[in-house]
Amino acid sequence: VQTGDISEERLNESVRRILTLKEKRGVLNFDPSARTAEKAEEAVGSSLNRDLERKIAAAAVTVVKNEDNTLPFKVQTGDHVLLLGAFENEVPGLNLGMRRLIADGVLPKDTSFVAKNFTKESTLDSLKEDLEKATHIVVISEIGYEGQLDKDFWRTKIPTEIVNYANTNHKKAAVLSISKPYDV
């Protein structure tokens, strides 16, 4: 404002917009002492919290391709789901998601699953035992830049081999593309 780059009117408009949003969200009169660990533990994981998580997640997903109406998976009693992440740090989230889906009745109670990650040392043969047991396969493709699309790059090669295996063996498979959309 002092240098004239932004007018005082423009600054006031921005402040008004921010304050209006804060008022709408109920954070103008934020009282940190009202936020306790007990209240947080009560809210996180609650039905309301879980419903909101699902709505946000559903709004964030874009289905690019759905051949043969594979999605959503129709997991039946006794089915086995294999989830393969590109990195070890993805496995806890995959496990949590499956446990929640089973606990919430979205998947049958006797659905079994394995969540693990593949690495650049992984081969189709090293994953074969898990692939053979699976009725449904979810593999994460995590491509961060265009150069990783090379067919021999492990984060491209392994998901491709897994999907080819699933197609050959009549198993339902989905690729979950995260990171940048180069692999889409």
For each predicted feature, which ranges?
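Preference for extracellular/luminal or secreted protein segments
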Residues: 1-184
